[in-house]
């Protein structure tokens, strides 16, 4: 998911995406440990997606705090 697509989401949608991505990452790591994972690069892409989601969420938190001051 691109940063532009993430910025179009609402804050609650971003939080939901973070939650589902973390679950996916957990499952991928479990598959890797048991030797069932064939597409190991998927772990990297999910981690980067989580980072993008968290970055946009934090940007919004900062904007809200600036608006309240």
From Swiss-Prot:
InterPro entries listed in its UniProt record: Ribosomal_protein_uL29, Ribosomal_uL29, Ribosomal_uL29_sf
Pfam families: Ribosomal_L29
Keywords, comma-separated and alphabetical: Ribonucleoprotein, Ribosomal protein
One cellular component term from this protein's GO annotations in UniProt: cytosolic large ribosomal subunit
MF-aspect GO terms: structural constituent of ribosome
Cross-referenced SUPFAM superfamilies: Ribosomal protein L29 (L29p)
Superkingdom in the source lineage: Bacteria
Any one of the GO BP annotations: translation
PANTHER family xref list: 60S RIBOSOMAL PROTEIN L35/50S RIBOSOMAL PROTEIN L29 (PTHR10916), LARGE RIBOSOMAL SUBUNIT PROTEIN UL29C (PTHR10916:SF0)
Cited NCBIfam families: L29
Family listed: Belongs to the universal ribosomal protein uL29 family.
Name of this protein: Large ribosomal subunit protein uL29
Species: Staphylococcus haemolyticus (strain JCSC1435)
Upper classification of the organism: Bacteria, Bacillati, Bacillota, Bacilli, Bacillales
Chain's gene name: rpmC
């Amino acid at each position: 998911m691109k940063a532009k697509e993430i910025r179009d989401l609402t804050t609650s949608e971003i939080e939901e995406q973070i939650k589902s991505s973390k679950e996916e990452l957990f499952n991928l790591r479990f598959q890797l440990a048991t030797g069932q994972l064939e597409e190991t690069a998927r772990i990297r892409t999910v981690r980067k997606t989580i980072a993008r989601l968290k970055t946009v969420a934090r940007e919004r938190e900062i904007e809200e705090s600036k608006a309240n001051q």
